[in-house]
Regions:
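Acidic, PIN/NYN-like endoribonuclease modules and their adjacent C-terminal/linker elements
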Residues: 1, 98-129
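Short, well-structured N-terminal submotif of metal-dependent ribonuclease cores
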Residues: 1-35, 50-60, 125-129
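Active-site flanking residues adjacent to catalytic metal/cofactor-binding acidic residues
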Residues: 4, 41, 110
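Alpha-helix/helix-capping structural signal
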Residues: 7-8, 38, 112-113
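Residues that scaffold the ATP/ADP-binding catalytic core of kinase and kinase-like folds
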Residues: 11-13, 46, 117
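Active-site neighborhoods of divalent-metal-dependent phosphate/nucleic-acid chemistry enzymes
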Residues: 19, 68-113
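Active-site-proximal, substrate-binding regions of enzyme catalytic domains
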Residues: 42-70, 83
Length: 129
C-alpha cells in the first residue's frame, strides 16, 4: 500500500498538469492507495480555495475517488458522514472533526454556529462554551 500526499490527489482530480496527472492516475490505478484524513483536509482546502470547487462538486469528486477499488481511506465511514454534512452546509474540517468524535458523549466548542449545525445536521450533542 502506498500513502499519497495532497498534490497527488489534486493532480489526479484537477488534471491541470498533464504529465503529473497521468503519473498520478497510473499510480492510483495500479497500486493500493492509502489516504489519510489530513490529506483529505488539505485536498478539500486546495480544491475549494484555488480551484473554486463547490461543496457538491468537491464531495462528488472525493466520493468518486473513494469508490475506486484501489483507494483506502482512513476512517472511511467517518469521511462519508463528513461529506454528507459538508453538503448540508458544515465546513468540511468541522464535519470531519465531528465525525471523528463519534465515540464522544458531547462535542464542545466556542463556535456557536458549529454547535447549532452539529445539533441540526449531524445530530451531535454539541456543547457551546
Amino acid at each position: 500500500m502506498i500513502a499519497v500526499d495532497t498534490n497527488v490527489l489534486v493532480r489526479f482530480l484537477v488534471r491541470d498538469d498533464a504529465g503529473q496527472a497521468a503519473r498520478a492516475a497510473e499510480l492510483i490505478r495500479s497500486s493500493e492507495i492509502w489516504i489519510s484524513k489530513t490529506v483529505l483536509l488539505e485536498t478539500e482546502w486546495v480544491l475549494r480555495s484555488l480551484y473554486d470547487f463547490t461543496p457538491q462538486r468537491l464531495a462528488g469528486a472525493l466520493r468518486a475517488l473513494a469508490g475506486l477499488g484501489t483507494v483506502f481511506l482512513e476512517d472511511a465511514g467517518g469521511v462519508a458522514k463528513a461529506l454528507n454534512w459538508f453538503e448540508q452546509g458544515l465546513d468540511f474540517a468541522d464535519a470531519l472533526h465531528l465525525a471523528s468524535a463519534a465515540n464522544a458523549k458531547q462535542f464542545a466548542t466556542f463556535d456557536r454556529k458549529l454547535a447549532r449545525q452539529a445539533q441540526l445536521a449531524a445530530k451531535v450533542d454539541a456543547l457551546s462554551l
